[in-house]
Amino acid sequence: MGAEAFYDEYIAPALTDFISRRFEGVCRDYFSLQVRSGKMKGVRNIGSYYYDDPIYRKNGEFDVALEFADGYEIYEAKYYAQPMTLDEIHREVQQVEEIKELTVKQIGFIAINGFAERKEPYLYLDGNDIFANE
């Protein structure tokens, strides 16, 4: 196996997964900084939200979950080479809406390369928002 084939087979997939996971952490750090600077108020906890529904045999993870007294803000973080599409947004929204025990106040999306389209009432952040030095 040549070097290029080895990279394509073993390194590239692991690298993509690593960068995506690290980007999720950067997004959580962004919200931590927003809270510490006073730009966001009322956040009790910042993390990921994992769910397991044995009745419907569904499980999954939401990348960024902000806990408030009256519910959660859920954000899906995507480290894509291209803008996030409206179809992807709709699939993610459907996944959030299927979780009945979770009180969701707001759904948002974070895409490093922005969005092909934006639809109300969701919140949108891109790489410029996350990495702005404000």
Where would I find each of the regions flagged by the language model?
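A cross-kingdom feature that marks ATP-driven nucleic-acid transaction machinery
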Residues: M1-E134
